[in-house]
C-alpha cells in the first residue's frame, strides 16, 4: 500500500523538462545537424546513425529534435560520436 507521501510524489513527478519537452538535447541535435555542410537532412542523419548501428528513422529524429520523444543513453552517445561533441554538450552542460 502506498503512503500519502508516495501518492503526492507520483502526482508531482513528471518526466519532462521545464518547458514540457521529453528531452533536453533535441534542439542541440537539430542545431548541430543544420550546421553540417552540405546541410544534413533528418533522413541523412538517420541513415548515418543506422550505419553506426543505431536503428532510428527520420520520424524518430524529427520527434527527438522537437522534444516529443525520449532519448536513451545509447542514442545520446551515438549522436555525440557522430557530431564529434561530448554528451555534456548535447545535454547543455558547460564545457570544463
Regions found by a protein language model. Give the residues of each.
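Short alpha-helical elements of helix-turn-helix
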Residues: 27, 43, 58-59, 73-76
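Short alpha-helical DNA-recognition segment
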Residues: 38-63
Amino acid at each position: 500500500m502506498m503512503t500519502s507521501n508516495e501518492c503526492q510524489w507520483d502526482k508531482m513527478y513528471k518526466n519532462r523538462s521545464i518547458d514540457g519537452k521529453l528531452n533536453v538535447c533535441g534542439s542541440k541535435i537539430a542545431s548541430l545537424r543544420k550546421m553540417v555542410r552540405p546541410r544534413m537532412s533528418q533522413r541523412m542523419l538517420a541513415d548515418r546513425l543506422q550505419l553506426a548501428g543505431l536503428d532510428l528513422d527520420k520520424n524518430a529524429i524529427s520527434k527527438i529534435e522537437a522534444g516529443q520523444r525520449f532519448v536513451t543513453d545509447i542514442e545520446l552517445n551515438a549522436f555525440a560520436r557522430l557530431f564529434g561533441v561530448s554528451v555534456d554538450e548535447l545535454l547543455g552542460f558547460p564545457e570544463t
